[in-house]
Amino acid sequence: MSVIKMTDLDLAGKRVLIRADLNVPVKDGKVTSDARIVATLPTIKLALEKGAKLMITSHLGRPTEGEYNEEFSLAPVVNYLKDALSCPVRLAKDYLDGVEVAAGELVVLENCRFNKGEKKNTEELAKKYAALCDVFVMDAFGTAHRAEGSTYGVAQFAPVACAGPLLAGELEALGKAMLKPERPMVAIVGGSKVSTKLTVLESLSKIADQLVVGGGIANTFIAAAGHNVGKSLCEHDLIDTAKKLAAETNIPVTTDVVVGAEFSESTPATIKSVADVTDGDMIFDIGPDSAKALADIIMNAKTILWNGPVGVFEFDQFAEGTKVIAEAIAASPAFSIAGGGDTLAAIDKFGIADKVSYISTGGGAFLEFVEGKVLPAVAILEQRAKA
């Protein structure tokens, strides 16, 4: 992937606009989870060290376009940045006609979704963003799959458009896992439905040496192998699709499962062979034999891509399968990349964040890359790099 990188540019005295992903949860005017801001801090610090006249913008929540709404203001993010950077940070509300920034100063441009034309990516708005800067830096991988004014349009018209360190790192890690994987490559895909992950499964079936399926997705494959899945979440209309994927790909067969009578935190868990599942059972996790077999596969891998838990890990009695998988990934010397909201929650629960080679910041963008789709905000950077 050939893009201009911010790290290679001289930013001294230049007006630099960074599109970051600062879409963080806020409660009572305070940031409640700072992961995305923390991920962006090295980019901000580097630009300031390089002497840039620095502006940064992001969306936050889903406000009505064209209307200011304090609930979705970036003010709490500004307060957080002041503390984190130990320097003054200004919030600019009306900035589309220009904003004064000194070298080494940071100005946060208010929620870009307050601007009319942001989501539709109107040329008028894109040109206004572009006029604010000498260098545009796209550093929000989480929104790279959306062609919006602040992610795509501005990159068309800015004098220079480049990738920030976070975006460049994300593309490098995904490229390493998907485009040039060291083999054997194992992909783990969990989640509740085959239908929502079908393109991911089809794409990975062409790349992975072994494709591990978990969660509700696995139930459809268990049914496709001719077993009873009782009252479990299962897409019976996709059994033929599962059979086709199983025939074309090396998908390890689940041999035992953990079942319960109902979806509840207090329902007792019972380990059963897949052959013994009854009409009243609901499958909520893989059993210990299956988990051990998958852990062995993971330990022999050279590349691991993980998207989605293999059981209802939020309930402790159905968490063991995902825990075993997580610990195997943590112990494996392979290059590992993980992405998707539930996956990140599982990584947090089992405390393995520092043992995964790369944790992707993008949910939808991560999946679209894995599906082999073009990410518009990356495509425009590649186009500009060629020009």
UniProtKB/Swiss-Prot annotation:
It is found in: Cytoplasm. Its EC number is 2.7.2.3. This is Phosphoglycerate kinase. It comes from the Bacteria. One of its GO terms (biological process) is glycolytic process. It is an enzyme of class 2 (transferase). Substrate binds at D21, L22, N23, R36, H59, L60, G61, R62, R113, R146. One of its GO terms (cellular component) is cytosol. One of its GO terms (molecular function) is ADP binding. InterPro entries: Phosphoglycerate_kinase, Phosphoglycerate_kinase_CS, Phosphoglycerate_kinase_N, Phosphoglycerate_kinase_sf. Keywords: ATP-binding, Cytoplasm, Glycolysis, Kinase, Nucleotide-binding, Transferase. The keyword Chaperone does not apply. Pfam families: PGK. Monomer. It catalyses: (2R)-3-phosphoglycerate + ATP = (2R)-3-phospho-glyceroyl phosphate + ADP. Pathway: Carbohydrate degradation; glycolysis; pyruvate from D-glyceraldehyde 3-phosphate: step 2/5. The keyword ATP-binding applies. ATP binds at K197, E314, G340, G341, D342, T343. Belongs to the phosphoglycerate kinase family.
